[in-house]
Design a protein with these regions (language model features):
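AMP-binding/adenylate-forming catalytic core of the ANL superfamily
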Residues: 236, 336, 341-344, 348-453
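Hydrophobic beta-strand positions
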Residues: 318, 337, 384, 469-470
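Conserved AMP-binding/adenylate-forming
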Residues: 269-362
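AMP-binding/adenylate-forming
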Residues: 149-152, 158, 182-241
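Nucleotide 5′-phosphate-binding alpha/beta core
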Residues: 1-133, 140-173, 178, 230-235, ...
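Residue-level signal for inorganic ion chemistry
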Residues: 62, 134, 183, 236, ...
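Adenylate-forming
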Residues: 216-219, 223, 233-274, 287-294
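Residues that mark the start of a beta-strand
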Residues: 180-183, 334, 421
Length: 508
């Protein structure tokens, strides 16, 4: 006997469940991580087939945005001819922010209000959209948005490729047998920063096997070391400059952890940093990632250390200054990125000022994914002298956090001009008051110096300018730039936060 009413009720219930963002996120993540793992060792034809299907999907989505509508006629879309689409810059994109999202999503006013509320970091805008901000390598703050399903796909590709060596029956069984895997992210917190969002928005199915903790990169090093010693992570992720500091703490006998995997991102992993990490954690697998807030899943390294582009999820076009493709083995002037996963705010041929080199020789790991080498992408570590004469190492990411979430700030550069003399150059948004922006920057910079016991010994100056010069060769804005050579003596960790009376600037 059939019960039509019961069938209709079941169908309605299923539809209701699938409309819930949390459910869609879990289902998409689970499906895509299996798909991505299979493609990691697939022949090139299978990768190209997935890439083509996703390109068709993202071009169709881009046509629904006012920003791309005119550039994507039927012929361009049918031929999948990316070369017929003019590259877009970050400035062009942000100038028409509301036009970059699909119809009926969110507008610029809603996005700006959301990112200016740091307490809402990790939550969803309109119960469906994840919003992140970045300054990237241009010094200009940008806002980017994903829907929950696009974000679940992004997470799945990112994690499946980073942990490609662990996605096998034996390693999965071993991980389950030992209980939850402890993963610690030492990253920028307190705002809508992509890596922190990657750490915090773990799907329910992931929380069954993963205990994820986020620690602020702004913590004084002794506090951070103590927290890591207590957490004893199996997996540790941070920025290369921070990982290098932590490696030195381990070699000095203060950091007592033995992670199975260390992953790095947001900065280029330099040879000195790589060597320091390997010396400090000789049994650890080191994985380098290449990512941007606009496209988190660009590349990750294999067991042989080669960076492999996630060709099934993004298209990277290395080009010269004139926008012409560069051959394999040549270093590009910039990269045109097409994100094949974000259907809410499609990015097609979006220019980032990174320099990459596509490697010609096949990788010993056997992967059919493209191998690349990233050049440049390095801000400086500042070595500041405390009042007792000792030096402190301050990596760039915590310094960059001083400048994010400042209303009215368009672009910035922090320069270590001479020993213990910092100079801030900044550009304000149209209509913003320079004096107000300067006052807020001064307060945030002073707070940082107080927290690191440097307020008495470091001089600062701020200057509003019309534009910030780009590097002559890389064409990038060096946001955190040091003109001071590293000290030859002992460098110690920044001290724990201490309460200090702030003297008026006129007394300094």
């Amino acid at each position: 006997m059939s019960f039509p009413g019961l069938s209709l009720a079941k169908s309605a219930l299923s539809s209701t469940i699938h409309r819930r963002p949390a459910v869609r996120e879990v289902l998409t993540f689970t499906e895509q991580i299996a798909r991505t793992a299979a493609l990691s060792s697939a022949p090139r034809a299978a990768i190209e087939a997935t890439r083509t299907a996703r390109l068709d999907r993202v071009l169709a989505a881009a046509r629904e945005t006012p920003f791309y509508r005119d550039a994507l006629d039927d012929d361009v879309v049918r031929r999948r001819d990316l070369s017929a689409i003019a590259p877009v810059t970050k400035a062009q994109f942000l100038a028409r922010l509301s036009d970059t999202v699909r119809r009926g999503v969110v507008d610029e006013r809603e996005m700006l209000a959301f990112v200016r509320a740091p307490e809402r970091a990790g939550t969803l805008l309109s119960d469906n959209y994840l919003v992140a901000m970045t300054s990237g390598t241009t010094g200009q703050v940008g806002i980017f948005v994903n829907d929950v399903e696009s974000w679940a796909e992004t997470r799945a590709v990112t994690f499946a490729r980073i942990f490609r060596q662990q996605l096998n029956t034996m390693d999965i069984a071993r991980a389950i047998a030992r209980g939850k895997t402890r993963m610690v992210f030492v990253v920028a917190t307190g705002g809508h920063y992509m890596t922190a969002l990657l750490a915090s928005r773990v799907p329910a199915i992931g929380r069954m096997v993963l205990d994820s903790t986020t620690l602020s990169v702004e913590m004084p090093l002794p506090v951070l070391v103590a927290r890591l010693n207590a957490a004893k992570p199996h997996i540790l992720h941070s920025y290369p400059t921070v990982l290098e500091l932590l490696a030195n703490e381990a070699k000095a006998g203060r950091l007592h952890i033995a992670p199975d995997i260390v992953t790095s991102g947001s900065e280029r992993l330099s040879l000195p940093a790589r060597e320091a990490i390997r010396q400090a954690f000789p049994a650890t697998q080191l994985v380098e990632t290449y990512a941007a807030t606009e496209c988190v899943h660009m590349a990750s390294s294999c067991a042989h250390g080669a960076l492999h582009v996630n060709d099934d999820a993004c298209i990277l076009e290395p080009v010269d200054d004139e926008g012409r493709p560069v051959p394999k083995g040549a270093v590009s002037a910039r990269v045109l990125v097409t994100n094949l996963l974000n259907l809410t705010q499609p990015l097609v041929r979006y220019a980032i000022t990174d320099q990459i080199e596509v490697l010609d020789e096949p990788c010993p790991c056997g992967s059919a994914l493209t191998s690349v080498r990233v050049h440049g992408r390095t801000d400086d570590t500042f070595f500041l002298q405390a009042h007792d004469g000792s030096f402190q190492a301050h990596p760039p990411i915590p310094l960059e956090l001083i400048f994010l979430s400042v209303p009215g700030l368009l672009q910035y550069q922090l320069v270590h001009e001479t020993q213990n003399a910092l100079r801030v150059l900044f550009v304000v948004e149209k209509g913003a008051l320079g004096a107000q922006v300067a006052a807020l920057l001064d307060a945030k910079l002073s707070r940082y110096l107080i927290e690191h016991d440097l307020y008495e010994s470091v001089r600062t100056s701020l200057e509003q300018v019309d534009a910030i010069a780009r590097h002559a060769d890389s064409k990038k804005v060096r946001q955190i730039l040091s003109r001071v050579a590293p000290p030859g003596g002992v460098v110690r960790a920044a001290p724990e936060v201490r309460e200090r009376r702030r003297r008026p600037r006129s007394e300094r």
